[in-house]
Amino acid sequence: REEKLAAWEDFEPLCLHDSTLSFASHALFAARNGLMGQAGAYFRKALYLDLEDIMGNTGKEGLHLACLGEVWQTVVFGFAGLHFADGAPRLAPHLPEGCTGLNFQFFYRGKKYKANISGSCGTVLRVK
């Protein structure tokens, strides 16, 4: 983790963010590594990339669906902290400021699960 954070400190200020995937990628990394202020700022840019035409190309290129997919990944794998250990889904939530809870469903190894997060506590239940 220290190596990742050192690389972030060195290279994040140098990023041009000229790709529509840049903001979401940075949000995901920051959220997974506890950099919540930066995660929130990058998340908002990624979330509103098309709605506010942040890159100035939504009209020419249409919606940036890959960015929207990575926004979803930031919510689920970043803020909710969904990961898999010992053959089971686990949560390590750290929600952004202003967000008090989160619920979502997902499939893992052919089984359906529901994740419920309130504050810093989360549970994963198998849905039958």
Residue spans for each PLM region:
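C-terminal capping/lid segments that line or modulate ligand- or cofactor-binding pockets
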Residues: 1-2, 17-101, 105-108, 112-114, ...
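C-terminal beta-sandwich/jelly-roll accessory domains of carbohydrate-active enzymes
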Residues: 121-128
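Alpha-solenoid helical repeat scaffolds
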Residues: 8-12, 44
